[in-house]
Swiss-Prot record:
Function: Involved in allosteric regulation of aspartate carbamoyltransferase.
Cofactor note: Binds 1 zinc ion per subunit.
Cysteines paired by S-S bonds: none
The species this protein was found in: Pyrobaculum islandicum (strain DSM 4184 / JCM 9189 / GEO3)
SUPFAM superfamilies: Aspartate carbamoyltransferase, Regulatory-chain, C-terminal domain (SSF57825), Aspartate carbamoyltransferase, Regulatory-chain, N-terminal domain (SSF54893)
InterPro entries, per database record: Asp_carbamoyltransf_reg_N (IPR020545), Asp_carbamoylTrfase_reg (IPR002801), Asp_carbamoyltrfase_reg_C (IPR020542), Asp_carbatrfase_reg_C_sf (IPR036792), Asp_carbatrfase_reg_N_sf (IPR036793)
Obligatory cofactor(s): Zn(2+)
Family as reported in the entry's similarity comment: Belongs to the PyrI family.
Cellular component GO terms held in the UniProt record: aspartate carbamoyltransferase complex
Pfam families: PyrI (PF01948), PyrI_C (PF02748)
GO MF terms, alphabetically ordered: metal ion binding
Protein name per its UniProtKB record: Aspartate carbamoyltransferase regulatory chain
Amino acid sequence: MSRELIVSKIRSGTVIDHIPAGRALAVLRILGITGKEGVRIALVMNVESKKLGKKDIIKIEDRELTPEEVNIISAVAPTATINIIEDFRVVRKFKVTPPEVIRGKFKCRNPTCITNAPREPVEPTFYLVRREPPLFICAYCGRYHELSDLI
């Protein structure tokens, strides 16, 4: 394996590393990143990793994620590591943790849940009931959701 950089370093922003292979697009989706924001975004998928075998990496230039955004990433990428970059250096590094509450990011998979009724302005809300592996429960219908249900 070569030690050359696949994607250049960023001056400032956020690097999301150790994303399970194939989940980077789901991370971008839950963060609401479309590519039209006007900031440079680098996406590398299926690169070799000692810890995961294969992994994805996302670099977002000139944007630091909020704590809420960081923790929501754990719903689709529980092994992710967040690196905050300033002046080409990592100034903070931490792992994501599942949030206690998720509001409005995912749809309940129960077709009869009130959050799926077209005339009901109810925001889907999920509560964390287990951290490892993450398990959430819908606040309205009580249906349990694992990661594969929410992605």
